[in-house]
């Protein structure tokens, strides 16, 4: 079997970097792109100076201002970011057409069969980053590895404006020391559970056989078994069609009533719409849906099949319907939308 050469390109603080490039007076100031702090907005991204104060993506804007009082919050210009992303993708296409965009600011490239630069994925990634800087005035980080999972992990290793290469021979030794929270799909709550079991890194996970993993993690066991060993069979799919988009929050303390659930909805909607704007040039919104995971880990979902609104009132209604099915403390809330490549025409009743 031919060893694959996968590159993951991740633009550095993309929205903020575009704004600093276009307005150099912002370069030495802490800035973020996001919503109004007075209207329950959230941060889409922050430059690295702001991150030193603890400002992070998906953080409420009011909290970001508390951490960094001098923070300049700019309203996002998604049309500009989409144009910039398109120009960057044109650079990718100079080397390969096997490109899988994940969002406006990151993508996977399969360069396994590319002959340019002597077929070296390392040199190709370096050349792409240099061209992005030369032609667009922006920096990118890159990860080079034998599969998508490892390439994405690698791109974060030397951020910002860095590159990390993981050869097939280095994978086993690298995985032993990789923290479990670096595994795709493991969030804060899952990581906390793993840590409580003494599983701090992938080497610890590798000591568990598949039967033990199944007892602990159910349907996720096989995925964990492979990923903790650096195994990922997924291909780079250039024509991937997305069927839905969602965001969710897992709470360290359960939400004990419906009103507490309602209070979380504006923040989730803001995060969802920021994510949608990144793909709105490709997809139309179809139907809203919600997901609730109760404290006993039972899950319910509700989809709105009649109206195509994606506002606060709609999601409150769906959350209420879902919550009333059990009327119990809530561990996780998720909001989402199904997607379509074609715009649906909604007929009126009269």
From Swiss-Prot:
Localization in the cell: Cytoplasm
Keyword terms of this UniProt record: Cytoplasm, DNA damage, DNA repair, DNA replication, DNA-binding, DNA-directed DNA polymerase, Magnesium, Metal-binding, Mutator protein, Nucleotidyltransferase, Transferase
GO terms for biological process, alphabetical: DNA-templated DNA replication; error-prone translesion synthesis; SOS response
HAMAP family referenced in this protein's UniProt entry, alphabetically: DNApol_IV
Name recorded for this polypeptide: DNA polymerase IV
Residue ranges occupied by any UmuC domain in the UniProt entry: 6-187
Disulphide connectivity of cysteines: none
Co-factor note (free text): Binds 2 magnesium ions per subunit.
Any single GO CC term annotated in Swiss-Prot or TrEMBL for this entry: cytosol
Species whose genome carries this gene: Protochlamydia amoebophila (strain UWE25)
Active site: 106
Positions bound to Mg(2+): 10, 105
Gene (name only): dinB
């Amino acid at each position: 079997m031919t060893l694959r050469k996968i590159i993951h390109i991740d633009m550095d603080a993309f929205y903020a970097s575009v704004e600093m490039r276009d307005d150099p007076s912002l370069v030495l100031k802490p800035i973020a792109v996001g919503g109004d702090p007075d209207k329950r907005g959230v941060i889409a991204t922050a430059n690295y100076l702001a991150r030193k104060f603890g400002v992070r993506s998906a953080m409420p804007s009011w909290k970001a201002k508390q951490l960094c009082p001098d923070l300049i919050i700019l309203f996002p210009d998604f049309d500009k970011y989409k144009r910039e992303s398109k120009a960057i993708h044109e650079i990718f296409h100079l080397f390969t057409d096997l490109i899988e965009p994940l969002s406006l600011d990151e993508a996977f490239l399969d360069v396994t069969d590319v002959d340019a630069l002597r077929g070296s994925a390392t040199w190709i990634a370096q050349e792409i980053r240099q061209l992005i800087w030369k032609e667009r005035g922006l920096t990118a980080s890159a990860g080079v590895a034998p599969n998508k999972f490892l390439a994405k992990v690698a791109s974060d290793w030397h951020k910002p404006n860095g590159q990390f290469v993981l050869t097939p021979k280095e994978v086993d030794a690298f995985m032993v020391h990789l923290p479990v929270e670096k595994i795709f799909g493991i969030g804060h709550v899952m990581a906390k559970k793993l840590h409580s079991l003494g599983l701090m890194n992938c080497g610890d996970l590798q000591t568990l056989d598949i039967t033990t993993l199944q007892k602990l993690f159910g349907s996720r066991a096989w995925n964990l078994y492979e990923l903790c060993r650096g195994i990922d069979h997924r291909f780079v799919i250039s024509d991937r069609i997305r069927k839905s988009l969602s965001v969710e929050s897992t709470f360290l303390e359960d939400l004990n009533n419906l009103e507490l659930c309602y209070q979380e909805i504006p923040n989730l909607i803001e995060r969802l719409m920021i994510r949608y704007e990144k793909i709105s040039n490709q997809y139309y919104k179809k139907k809203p849906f919600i997901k609730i995971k109760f404290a006993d880990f039972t899950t319910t979902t509700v989809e709105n099949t009649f109206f195509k609104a994606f506002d606060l009132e709609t999601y409150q209604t769906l959350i209420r319907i879902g919550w009333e099915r059990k009327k119990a403390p809530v561990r996780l809330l998720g909001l989402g939308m199904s997607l379509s490549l074609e715009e649906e025409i909604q007929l009126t009743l009269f």
